[in-house]
Amino acid sequence: MKFIDIRNCYKVYKNGVTAIADLTLAIDKGEFVFITGASGCGKSTLVKLLYREEKPTKGQVMVGGINVAKLYNSRVYKLRRKLGIVFQDFKLLPKLTVYENVAFGLENLGVKSKEIKRKVMKALERTGLLEKIKCFPNEISGGEQQRVCIARAIVNEPKLLICDEPTGNLDPKTSKEIVKLISKINKEMGTTVVMVTHDKEIVNSMKRRVITLENGVLTNDTMKGSYTADESD
């Protein structure tokens, strides 16, 4: 079974806009996949379907053996415990330190303090933040803030890491460092990575699988691909 298995999926919003149209897509465990396309093509809707922010109008969306389409709202937490999500906006809690931001989710899950410390320190080590654990978000750079977000996303060792424009607010040099870190996590932890991006240079340099959407339709799916999206619209 594929880790992500989407079949004949449609997402039509109440205003009649079709964001995803007859999408069939399979992603193996441990793959690194870029999702590309012009603004409004359905990229963000696709990843929202994966973490059940949206439900498909029609079709199947399976993530780690869970049928997202049939998942009751009260059971969404079971899916999200298998996921880590990194957004363009850092969404860090300003009054908490780096350590506390990464630990916050585990504390809410009722994880024992000794285990929290072990997991948090491991995540901070992976992301190169051990020297920043006592800092507050406003005391570190944008790139470091995004590293905190990545540490927070991987602290529970998720099977899937979803990155929605993770370099959108960063300069080119820092963007490359962040993607290099995500690639390292993919290789070392075996985490499946699905990354939405507009960054042509990063996509072209990575030579990973590239999926392109246009008006909600899959128009390209290439292993070791390059950025082919037409952003003229």
Regions found by a protein language model. Give the residues of each.
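Conserved ABC ATPase signature
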Residues: 136-140, 144-146
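Conserved ABC transporter NBD signature motif
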Residues: 59-67
